Amino acid sequence: MLKRNQPMLLERMGKMQSATDVAEYCKYDGFDGLKRAISLSDEEILNELDVAHLRGRGGAAYPLGKKWRHLYHAKGTTKYIVCNADEGEPGTFKDKVLLSEDPLSVIEGMIIAGYLFSAKAGYIYMRGEYRRIQKTFQEALDNARQAGFLGENILGIEGFNYDITIISGAGAYICGENSALLNSIEGKTGRPRVKPPHLADVGLYLQPTLVNNVESFASVPVILREGGQAFLEMGTADGGGTKLICLSGHIKNRGLYEVNLGTPLEEIIYGEQYGGGSATGRSLKFIHFGGQSGPIGAVATLRDCLYSYEDLWAHDLSVGSGAIVVMDDSVNVVDYLVHVAAFFAHESCGKCTPCRLGTTRILELLSKFNRNEATASDLPRLEKMLTHVTRLSACGLGQSVAKPMKSALALFPEEFETTAETEIYATSKGGW
């Protein structure tokens, strides 16, 4: 029976002698979720996922049960399972830990998906910089295959033939977008597709395809092993289970933690078992949630906020990838955003003009503020550019560029207006 504050995804870490050894994995409930899954009907498996209310852990927070049910009813005799392990989000390192320290949990989740959808092939698209982790994961795949959990007639079930292949990325952030990732697997340029159609209908090689994040796949065996209701009760009504969070920035205890959804944000930031408060002794100023594309929140306004999907959404924030970057009051938010904008300008794939040119113009404008060279017209120009890029970009990268900028503008307008006001004053007075 699961208990609140009991780790589910990090429970084996530090206990197993070898992260890739199947026998060690099985000592700690490994493959119990798969064994229960094959004892259930397809509808019972889907019902457990619906009850668990696991939201996708890659950032979009789409209910996993709905996604799996969509694929289950999709037309097509060939279906593919794809794990998105292209973890390129700055400030996010949770998938890296799961892949290196408990790879068999991810493999088990992918096998359960393969069983449910009668898939023959699964792919894990792993960040190119994770060369060492790719070797570890390949060793885990080989061991699982040798133990009879991959290959032909898995667990003695006639016709249950399924295997997983590692695909290495080449360091492009845009390939974290699911359709761009599938294009890359197919050997094409990693650029997003036009939607619809949904990937569950027309995905890899134009066949129905399931794409889930590493943490999402690792959570599936827990749901099947413990039951959807038990998983739901570990979180909140709007999002079950626990969430891996990555604490970084001006915070004392930087690192990876597993928290129950619904944990007070103040406890995460200041509690000694988690963040431990400011590392510099200065007051904490703002938090960047969910990766570079996530919104920014002021610490002072979040004292009563819970770390849950519904509560963060109510504050115009988001869980996103689980990244939590904390900055103290020595940081000017414009200085911080210049680095965020530079990241987006560099990683834009260039397919659509609004993102290709818009991210560059946003960086140029923020750099003007940063150099104290902005004029009174630059602030409305920046706001207009943010709106255009959001509305006209073809994929989620361009559509989310404005989130940190707009939230920072709303919270700290004085830090953007200072240089513009200085310009007006200097002009009206004829110089200093």
Give the residues covered by each predicted segment.
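Cofactor-/ligand-binding subdomain signature composed of acidic, glycine-rich
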Residues: 1-46
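Gly-rich Lys/Arg/Thr-decorated short loops/hinges at beta-loop-alpha junctions or inter-strand turns
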Residues: 25-31, 83-95, 199-204, 246-251
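Conserved phosphate/anionic-ligand binding catalytic regions in large, soluble enzymes, centered on
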Residues: 30, 51-71, 113, 171-183, ...
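Ferredoxin-type iron-sulfur electron-transfer modules in oxidoreductases and energy-metabolism complexes
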Residues: 32-48, 77-79, 85, 94-99, ...
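Short acidic, glycine/serine/threonine-rich loops at helix termini
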Residues: 60-68, 92-95, 134-139, 175-187, ...
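Histidine-anchored nucleotide/phosphate-binding helix
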Residues: 102-116
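Short amphipathic, charge-patterned alpha-helical segments
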Residues: 109-113, 260-279
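Hydrophobic alpha-helical positions that pack around
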Residues: 134-261, 279
